[in-house]
Swiss-Prot record:
Residues in the signal sequence: none
Modified residues (Asymmetric dimethylarginine): 335, 388
Motif 9aaTAD, residue numbers: 397-405
GO molecular function annotation: DNA binding; DNA-binding transcription factor activity, RNA polymerase II-specific; RNA polymerase II cis-regulatory region sequence-specific DNA binding
Protein name in UniProt: Nuclear factor 1 B-type
InterPro entries registered for this protein in UniProt: CTF/NFI (IPR000647), CTF/NFI_DNA-bd-dom (IPR020604), CTF/NFI_DNA-bd_CS (IPR019739), CTF/NFI_DNA-bd_N (IPR019548), MAD_homology1_Dwarfin-type (IPR003619)
Positions of modified residues (Phosphoserine): 264, 292, 295, 312, 328, 333
Subunit structure: Binds DNA as a homodimer.
Biased composition (Polar residues): 324-340, 407-420
Length: 420
C-alpha cells in the first residue's frame, strides 16, 4: 500500500504500523471522533446533540483528508503496540494480515489485572476497552464504549480476560437485535418497492411504526461501505479491498524490511512531533535504521531483538547521504543498500530504499553525556529544522577539530580561554 510519507512522521513509522495500517477500517476514524464530539458537546451544553448537528459532524469526519485519518490511525496503532505484550506483537501482526492461523494475543493488564482501557484520541476523556478497540479497528463494527458486555471470546481462546485477538472476539446477538434486523429489512424492502412488501402477511404491524425511533445518523448502506473500506483508501494508489498487498516484512521474518514509501509529496520540513496520546505513551524509535535483506545482520536478528534495539536511545548524528538520492558506483557506501527499483504502474520514480546497517556515532569530546542535552536524532526521511551543516564542514568531523584545546601550562591558551 502506498501512502504519502508526510502523513507519517518518524515517531509514527514502525514496521508494526506499516503492516497493520491497510487493515484498519475507515469507519474507525469517523466513529471514535463522532463519539468524542458527542460527549464533549454534552459536557459543555448539558444536552445531547440534535440530529442535524450530529449529521453535520458525521459528514465533516467522513470528508476529512485521508492523510489526517492515517495519521490518527498510526498513532493509535503505536499505542496498541505498547499495550500488547512484546512476545505477542509478531503473532498479532501475522494473524491480522492473514499469514498465520489466529492465536491468542495477550495485552498488558491494568493495576487490577483486568483488560486495559485507553483513550483513542488526544485529550479525550472517553476511554475504550482494548478488545472493543480491536473490533472497531479491524472489523469495522460500530460498537459503543459501553458494549463490553456484548463481546464474547472464542472457545479456542486460552486467556479470555486479556486476549485482544480480533479473530477471537465476537459480538453476541440477542433476540432484540434479531427482531430489529428483521424490522429494518422489511422497512427497506417497502421503500424500494419490493413485491414481497405487497404481501399483507409480511407487512410489519402498524403498532411497530411507533415503537422504534432511529437515533443514529448512519444509514445501512453507509455503514456497510465505511466498515468495508480500508482507511488507506484514497491516498497514493487505490487498491481494491481484495488486492491490498501484504507487508513483506512479516511475510518472512528473516528477510529484513522492505519499506514502501511514496514520493508524491516532499519530505516535511517541520520537526516531527512525539506521540502524546497520553502520559504513559512509550517513545517511538527515532534515528534508528531498519536492516536490509542484503545486510548480513538482517537474517540473524529476530523480531524481539529488532524491537528492543529500536527502543534504545540514540545520540544525535547526521547520515552521510540523503535516503532518496541517486548514487553513482563511485560513491557507494556499505551503509547504504538500495533495493532494485520496482516501479509501480503509473507512478514514475517510486523506488524502495533502506539503510542497511547502523554505525555507532563517533565518541563525543564533551565531558557529559550528549543524550541529556541533545534531542533524539531525526530519521533520515526528514530534515532537521535547527541543525545545519555548512558546505565546507564534514558532518563526520567531531567537535574537537573546531574547539581549541585548553592547556593550563600555556599562558596564551589560558588567557584566551578566560577572555573568550
Amino acid at each position: 500500500m502506498m501512502y504519502s510519507p508526510i502523513c507519517l512522521t518518524q515517531d509514527e513509522f514502525h514496521p508494526f504500523i506499516e503492516a497493520l495500517l491497510p487493515h484498519v477500517r475507515a469507519i474507525a476514524y469517523t466513529w471514535f471522533n463522532l463519539q468524542a464530539r458527542k460527549r464533549k458537546y454534552f459536557k459543555k451544553h448539558e444536552k445531547r446533540m440534535s440530529k442535524d448537528e450530529e449529521r453535520a459532524v458525521k459528514d465533516e469526519l467522513l470528508s476529512e483528508k485521508p492523510e489526517i485519518k492515517q495519521k490518527w490511525a498510526s498513532r493509535l496503532l503505536a499505542k496498541l503496540r505498547k499495550d500488547i505484550r512484546q512476545e505477542y506483537r509478531e503473532d498479532f501482526v501475522l494473524t491480522v494480515t492473514g499469514k498465520k492461523h489466529p492465536c491468542c494475543v495477550l495485552s498488558n493488564p491494568d493495576q487490577k489485572g483486568k483488560i486495559r482501557r485507553i483513550d483513542c484520541l488526544r485529550q479525550a476523556d472517553k476511554v475504550w476497552r482494548l478488545d472493543l478497540v480491536m473490533v472497531i479497528l479491524f472489523k469495522g463494527i460500530p460498537l459503543e464504549s459501553t458494549d463490553g458486555e456484548r463481546l464474547m471470546k472464542s472457545p479456542h481462546c486460552t486467556n479470555p480476560a486479556l486476549c485482544v485477538q480480533p479473530h477471537h472476539i465476537t459480538v453476541s446477538v440477542k433476540e432484540l437485535d434479531l427482531f430489529l434486523a428483521y424490522y429494518v429489512q422489511e422497512q427497506d424492502s417497502g421503500q424500494s418497492g419490493s413485491p414481497s412488501h405487497n404481501d399483507p402477511a409480511k407487512n410489519p404491524p402498524g403498532y411497530l411504526e411507533d415503537s422504534f425511533v432511529k437515533s443514529g445518523v448512519f444509514n445501512v448502506s453507509e455503514l456497510v461501505r465505511v466498515s468495508r473500506t480500508p482507511i488507506t483508501q484514497g491516498t497514493g494508489v487505490n487498491f481494491p479491498i481484495g488486492e491490498i498487498p501484504s507487508q513483506p516484512y512479516y511475510h518472512d521474518m528473516n528477510s529484513g524490511v522492505n519499506l514502501q514509501r511514496s514520493l508524491s509529496s516532499p519530505p516535511s520540513s517541520k520537526r516531527p512531533k512525539t506521540i502524546s496520546i497520553d502520559e504513559n505513551m512509550e517513545p517511538s524509535p527515532t534515528g534508528d535504521f531498519y536492516p536490509s535483506p542484503n545486510s548480513p545482520a538482517a537474517g540473524s536478528r529476530t523480531w524481539h531483538e529488532r524491537d528492543q534495539d529500536m527502543s534504545s536511545p540514540t545520540t544525535m548524528k547526521k547520515p552521510e547521504k540523503p535516503l532518496f538520492s541517486s548514487t553513482s558506483p563511485q560513491d557507494s557506501s556499505p551503509r547504504l543498500s538500495t533495493f532494485p527499483q520496482h516501479h509501480h504502474p503509473g507512478i514514475p520514480g517510486v523506488a524502495h530504499s533502506v539503510i542497511s546497517t547502523r554505525t555507532p556515532p563517533p565518541p563525543s569530546p564533551l565531558p557529559f553525556p550528549t543524550q541529556a542535552i541533545l534531542p533524539p536524532a531525526p530519521s533520515s526521511y526528514f530534515s532537521h529544522p535547527t541543525i545545519r551543516y555548512p558546505p565546507h564542514l564534514n558532518p563526520q568531523d567531531t567537535l574537537k577539530n573546531y574547539v581549541p584545546s585548553y592547556d593550563p601550562s600555556s599562558p596564551q591558551t589560558s588567557q584566551s580561554w578566560y577572555l573568550g
